[in-house]
Amino acid sequence: MTIKEAITNADSLQNNNFNQPMKIKWLSELEEKIMNEQFATHETLNEYEMRDWILYIRNMFLPLYTDDEETKENLEWDFDENTELLAPLEYQGMYTTYLLSKYALHSGEYERYSIFENKFSTEYQNFCNYINRTYKPLQKNKIEVS
């Protein structure tokens, strides 16, 4: 699923006045969450390459764990409508639900937001469970013998 497809799905379910760059920003925030919480903490497929504190994936550089504000500000985000989203097909519904929750939150529809946010949380947890079942956690522990 591409960013454009996720946005089209969400827009077909709920009319809204949010512009395309805002929707892309929301989806990029979710992708960053997925990478920081899942891909950075698990062994990944060959197409994912770790480089110090930056993850290079599908022609994008994305930050992992960093507290350096200057570094965060200087990173260029290269998300456009044709960017493929990370989740496998069976978990891609969470992108639509995530956008619907953002639409409701920023429109002041807090009851709808609560419903969509709960649904998104369940879908995201199912995706996390899939990652945990499929990939081994990164092992950074060491035993030193004196």
Where is each model-derived feature located?
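Conserved short "hinge" loops at termini or chain/domain junctions
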Residues: 1-84, 122-146
